[in-house]
Amino acid sequence: MKAFKGFSPELTSLLGDHKEETSRFVPGATMYAKESKTARTGYHCCENPFECLAYYAWDGKNRFWEVEARGDIDEDSQERISCTEIRLVKELTPFEFAYEGMLYMLNHPQRGNWQQAFKGCTVAKDEAEAREADDIAIARGENPKVKGGYNSILGLIKEKDGEILDAKIIRIVVPKMAGRWMTINENREVIMLEEEAD
């Protein structure tokens, strides 16, 4: 099962039993646990990558990986996963992390808990804003709008009555786009919105 996991800069898990053999990870290697029970035993990960931010801050130091969860898998109502086998598949860039989070919402539009508010990452109804480089802001709604600073990552998900109609993710690399509200049209083209006068 495809899932996501956060780590310290040294690829260690900050939660769990803190033993070297169960807390330090190696890319490509499979780790094994005897049993899995969410919030108790096994290796933990999340199906929604943004849920990892509840445990590891979006600070430019922590690392986020796509993982493969296998073996005995236990899930809880908070979308956490515990498994007896886990393998690090790919380290995600900030853009890939945001993309995977949007993809999760597109694949599971009816699931709750999609709104997120962490330092550096906001996923919100109707409008969201990112301030710094590599910060993430994703807006979801009938007429979503986003705004971000230079080199921030912005996502737009248009929906109506719970059905996803369109989506787009961009990185702000054109200076004139920084700090301006934007949305997408029916052709998924980015449209700058007029700023309201003070």
Regions found by a protein language model. Give the residues of each.
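Short, glycine-biased loop/turn motifs at secondary-structure junctions and
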Residues: 1-198
